[in-house]
A protein has these predicted regions:
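N-terminal membrane-targeting hydrophobic helices
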Residues: 1-224
């Protein structure tokens, strides 16, 4: 699936979930702000494809994408599990601040074209990562939210986990599948055979969004 398909499908799914839990959500005893999770899920939906040199993140992190096999370790349940543990353990404001800073920097690296980690020495690279408008704006917004609502940090990690997990689930509908049982098995599992950049991906997109719209209508009806 392309990045646009992953982001659109994952964000739409999380948006309906947030609509269903707009008054708040408890995730294993941890307070979650669903709409904060929607935003971070849109970022999380792109992260697994850091192993593709042509992807937005892969271009930023060439040293990773060139040495990683596509649909390898990033398409297992390892990262979502780590994010799950982080979500359950991030209960202090200091931890929330650290999470906000890291996600803000990540957003800057992903969406600011001026951040090129292939150029300059280590100090130039650090400057480019830290000093960019999109990254700084994201960081400031997240930090403000952290002080207004202490649940922001956990919500960010929860959203990243959901976005990453949805990406993997969506790729299970691709003919190449994912090694979700790694390290117990390296075999790729798939439940359908839709192909990337093929008319069948468009069909997958329509079916997914159609199902999301139906779910949204059911949620709205139950709330009336």
């Amino acid at each position: 699936m392309t990045g646009k398909t992953h982001v659109t499908c994952s964000t739409a799914t999380m948006a309906v979930f947030a609509l269903a839990h707009k008054s708040g959500y408890q995730f294993f005893g941890v307070d979650i702000l669903p709409w904060v999770g929607v935003i971070s899920a849109s970022v999380g939906a792109l992260l697994p494809d850091i192993d593709i040199p042509q992807s937005r993140l892969g271009q930023k992190f060439k040293f990773l994408s060139k040495n990683m096999k596509h649909r390898g370790i990033t398409h297992t349940l390892l990262a979502p599990t780590i994010l799950l543990l982080g979500t359950l353990s991030i209960k202090t404001r200091n931890a929330c601040i650290v999470a906000s800073l890291l996600v803000g920097l990540l957003v800057g690296m992903m969406f600011d074209a001026r951040v090129d980690l292939r150029k300059g020495n280590i100090f130039v690279k650090l400057k480019n990562i830290i000093v960019n408008k999109k990254g700084l704006t994201s960081t400031v917004v997240l930090l403000v939210l952290t002080f207004i609502a202490p649940a922001t940090g956990a919500s960010i990690l929860w959203g990243l986990m959901c976005g990453w997990t949805l990406h993997i689930f969506e790729d299970l509908f691709n003919s190449k599948g994912c090694p979700i049982l790694y390290p117990f098995s390296r075999g790729h599992i798939h439940i359908a055979s839709f192909k990337t950049r093929h008319w069948s991906e468009g069909l997958f997109f329509l079916l997914w969004i159609g199902g999301t719209i139906i779910w949204a209508l059911i949620v709205i009806k139950t709330q009336l």
